[in-house]
Amino acid sequence: MKTGYLIDMDGVIYRENQLIPGARDFVEALIGSGAPFVFLTNNSAPTPEDLSVRLGHLGIPGLSSRHFYTSALNTADFLGETHPGCTVFVIGEGGLLTALHERRIPNDGLHPSYVVVGEGAVSMEKLAKAHSCIEGGARLLATNPDNWCPVSSEGTRPGAGATAAFLEASTGRRAYYLGKPNGYMFHRARRKLVEMTGGSSLEEIVMIGDTMETDIRGAIEAGLHAYLVLSGSTQAESLIDYVYQPTRVLGSVADLIEELRSGKPSSRLDSPVFSLPGVKRRRVGNRHQTDIQVHNKPRPRAPMTR
């Protein structure tokens, strides 16, 4: 059975600047098995080359840029495929700017077709410019729905979703969110896996991630197998909160090493049944814009007062 793998990075392969135990052996086992694999991240700031270098520094060298697919690349693919000839005003940097440039999507600070929001430094001046562009008819597009992203074991930073939400509130216009769990991210990632096989079809595609709202939800809605690892942002007791459930629940990617080496999948393919007592948890806030229930109509803007 030919299986392809889509793999989240933060919380699955590394945390902060350290590899998760077993991650290096897992990647080596993947390469040894001959299975096609792509690292799939909502972070729009790095380029695939940046991510390859980072993994090399952490102890997983030799991966080419074709093994990485970011929400920046997904955004550029979406615009190039659905609106060729469009222009953009960008709030973002690094990987997002590079991806748009490589797709020959020009920047336009006067009358852009889209305001595109990614990760990176944000100024009030740039937000005001984006607001003006949207009021002038530009559509609002976010590379991903993440309101916040972890930067350390104790700290976070605002994400693209939070910036897009600011502009939604100020303009009354809805953003369209790409990246995980949007089906277009999984559609393009699936295409990359097939290209790696030389066009041969895959009997099975597995998404391995640590976040229920993006990795697992997106995989299930795309018809993929969804493997949740508990080495990142999700705790086992929180699974009772979700209507959708992963195909398997693993401690970390280390649990898959022997399967990859032997080529024999475990007979235990279903998630365990969690019969956990109700747990009171402090809700910090929705991590993703897709967590917030919304209507498919423009958000009303409060009248201005003078």
Where on the chain are the PLM-derived regions?
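N-terminal phosphate-binding loop and flanking beta/alpha elements of the actin-like ATPase fold
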Residues: P36
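Asp-based, Mg2+/Mn2+-dependent phosphohydrolase catalytic module
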Residues: K2-M9, Y14-G32, S44-Y69, A76-R301, ...
